[in-house]
Amino acid sequence: MAKKKFNREKIHLNVGTIGHVDHGKTTLTAALTKVSSDLYGSECRPFDSIDNAPEERERGITISTSHVEYESETKHYAHVDCPGHADYIKNMITGAAQMDGAILVCSAVDGPMPQTREHILLARQVGVPTIIVYLNKADCVKDKELLELVEMEIRELLTEYDFDGNNTKIIIGSALLALENKDDNQLGTSSIIKLLEILDKNIPVPNRIIDKPFLMPIEDVFSISGRGTVVTGKIERGIIKTGEEIEIVGFKETIKTIVIGIEMFKKTLDEGFAGENVGILLRSIKREEVERGQVLIKSGTIKPHTNFICEVYILSKEEGGRHTPFFKGYKPQFYFRTTDITGICDLPKNIEMVMPGDNVKLIVKLLSSIAIEKGLRFAIREGGKTVGAGIITEVLND
């Protein structure tokens, strides 16, 4: 069967759910697809199909990142359901990087929890510009004052991490009611319609970096029998067209290849634009020649490097960071785009150690070369937790 062409008439935005485990992120994602399907005819995705990695069902927590799509009156949304469990922050970092705006889901029963804070912090680190709040499970809260208290706590938390907490839009509702087609006290379907309207009005259409040379971090690699190797990811900048020559950069020798096909949501495209999640079919490339964490680029635009200078913020103990200082030779993991890689830190001449809560310049040497450039942001991780965030200020010749 021939694949349908992708409809470009509506403005395209990337959003996603963030928040504490079991506060209802996946239920809300399913409710958004259901209400949008009823109103605008897009595909309805049941809860089970979004919460779809096998180990999730046993423990009731979302591990992998699910992509769904839905529409509002004026926009087309690609929605990432981000993992909520602290153990899966690594996925959160790659997921949250794909958002023009985030929907923070917080249970009205429990209020903000440790991962609520951690996800807001991560959203700030990876540059999510806008957060909309969905105060879920409001049908289980009879005391209006309690709702107001939770709302106030969330606003204070957002302000603490440099979001505009006072003016953040907060929708009070119940995703489960909406999923069951109920609307008690306008907390069900009505709250989802309101959320769609608020997404439309409050998530700014980003200036897609279309004029810059093409770059796409590789998230996943598949072999398609009889066709070749497909890599998937979100185009960070530029435009890619079938027939164009590109390079695969990072970890190994740079490889040149030709794009022979582009797809989005199982529909074929002639070209892919910045901001879109696509699959790209590559000519004469074997599955084992490509891996997650490499990038596709317009030929000759980026060289791989291992050394750089960066400005970093090291989280304080209170923010969930390290409890002790680190010294020259510290070797944490650096998370760039879709890859994590160990790096060795050197300190400026006048600094002997870095304390939790410090803002400092570091000179870093990565253990393998990857595609990096000035302005690239990253997270610093150690022992399963985020300990810092940074931005590259200068790439050094190796």
UniProtKB/Swiss-Prot annotation:
Residues 136-139 are annotated as: G4. GO terms for cellular component: cytosol. Its main location: cytoplasm. GTP binds at residues 19-26, 81-85, 136-139. Residues 60-64 are annotated as: G2. The keyword Protein biosynthesis applies. It is found in: Cytoplasm. Keywords: Cytoplasm, Elongation factor, GTP-binding, Hydrolase, Magnesium, Metal-binding, Nucleotide-binding, Protein biosynthesis. Mg(2+) binds at T26. Residues 174-176 are annotated as: G5. InterPro entries: EF-Tu_GTP-bd (IPR041709), EF-Tu_GTPase (IPR050055), EFTu-like_2 (IPR004161), EFTU_2 (IPR033720), G_TR_CS (IPR031157), P-loop_NTPase (IPR027417), Small_GTP-bd (IPR005225), T_Tr_GTP-bd_dom (IPR000795). It catalyses: GTP + H2O = GDP + phosphate + H(+). It is an enzyme of class 3 (hydrolase). Residues 19-26 are annotated as: G1. It comes from the Bacteria. Residues 81-84 are annotated as: G3. GO terms for molecular function: GTP binding; GTPase activity; guanosine tetraphosphate binding; translation elongation factor activity. The keyword Cytoplasm applies. Monomer. Belongs to the TRAFAC class translation factor GTPase superfamily. Classic translation factor GTPase family. EF-Tu/EF-1A subfamily. GTP hydrolase that promotes the GTP-dependent binding of aminoacyl-tRNA to the A-site of ribosomes during protein biosynthesis. This is Elongation factor Tu. It comes from Carsonella ruddii (strain PV). The gene is tuf.
